[in-house]
Regions:
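A cross-kingdom feature marking solvent-exposed beta-strand/loop segments within repeated
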Residues: 20, 26-29, 40-41, 45, ...
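Asp-based, Mg2+/Mn2+-dependent phosphohydrolase catalytic module
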Residues: 1-11, 127-170, 174-178, 182-201, ...
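Alpha-helical substrate-recognition element adjacent to the catalytic core
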Residues: 2-106, 173-267
Length: 329
């Protein structure tokens, strides 16, 4: 019987998002592929430390108790020999990851289709943008900012796992992440007043799917399975958005139309998201705006969804910060 991943939540993740390969990556990005490969060979038997998204992957794989619901695949620009170190690091850390694709410097996102991936996490912004523009759910993993000099991704992943050992917590921005950027375009082109009027007038019309809607839908299915099967690991989701009333109504009605339930919704009206994320304690947070990612990355692992009106041109997301604090996404 042929093997298929069609009924699984498939997460494709780069080796640098999964493990701390920052030192090796500096050699790679310097353009000396031979020196990079030699460095990886020298460290072949040295397990890499956990990276930014390690904690989330470990918890997602814990959902496979009793049945195989989640597949994590390493999808990397590294060469196949460097892939040996990635797999041995998985084994050392107890991650049951069995599949990987290594492209030796070529962009790897084309393999998302045969993998049927519900999410692609990478530290490479070009790969993420290419995947998003091709219609695949993807996010650029932001480097963590640590509150203490002695902290790193490994210690922070461990601390997060210990805090909520039996619960996967994932937080999403709304517009241009879960939802399309339709409302964001109104704001960018016509201003806050037009945005509020547009959302109030269209409150009964569901928004179109955003790039990470497939991930939320897959998590919702797993959430129902976990609740029904008395799984030890639970899933809890949150919508963390700069929308406020009356624009909140269309967001909730859209989720209702999709038959997707979320556990928490925060309509912040431009307040900084970081303090609210600190209370929710997510394992991962997704947002389309650099500003919100910067606010969040000292609190949690963060992914930038570089698509939509806020990312339409270089510098646009940053340039709009002073005016975007009271609007939709």
């Amino acid at each position: 019987m042929s093997v298929s991943l069609t009924d699984k939540l498939v997460v494709a993740i780069s080796s640098r998002a999964l493990f701390d390969f920052e030192e090796e990556n500096r050699v790679f990005e310097a353009g000396d592929l031979g020196a990079y490969e030699q460095l990886q060979r020298e460290r072949l038997n040295v397990p890499a430390r956990p990276g930014v998204a390690f904690g989330l992957m470990r918890k997602l794989l814990a959902l496979n108790t009793g049945a195989h619901h989640v597949e994590v695949v390493i999808l990397s620009r590294s060469d196949p020999i460097s892939g040996l170190r990635a797999f041995s690091s998985c084994r050392e850390h107890g991650l049951n990851i069995q599949r990987g694709v290594f492209t030796r410097g070529r962009t790897p996102w084309h393999y998302l289709k045969p993998l049927n991936a519900s999410l692609f996490l990478s530290a490479n912004p070009d790969d993420v943008r290419a995947a998003l523009e091709a219609g695949f759910p993807a996010a650029r993993v932001f480097p963590r900012v640590f509150p203490r000099p002695d902290a790193n991704s490994a210690t922070m992943s461990a601390a997060s796992a210990d805090r909520n050992a039996n619960e996967i917590r994932i937080a999403f921005d709304g517009d241009a992440v879960l939802f399309s950027d339709e409302a964001e375009q109104i704001f960018q082109q016509q201003g806050l007043g037009a945005f509020v009027s547009h959302e109030r007038d269209n409150r009964d019309l569901p928004l179109a799917h955003g790039p990470l809607q497939p991930l939320l839908a897959a998590l919702h299915r797993l959430q129902k399975l976990a609740d029904g099967n008395a799984q030890n690991m639970r899933i809890r989701t949150a919508l963390v958005t700069a929308r406020s009333a009356p624009a909140h109504e269309r967001a909730i009605r859209t989720l209702m139309a999709w038959n997707i339930e979320i556990d928490e919704a925060m309509f912040l009206g431009g307040l900084e998201k970081g303090p609210f994320l600190r209370e929710f304690e997510p394992d991962f947070f997704f947002d389309d705006q650099i500003r919100h990612c910067e606010s969040a990355r000292s609190v949690t692992a963060t992914g930038h969804v570089a698509l939509g009106a806020a990312n339409a041109a270089p510098g646009l997301a940053t340039a709009s910060h002073t005016t975007a604090d009271t609007r939709a996404p």
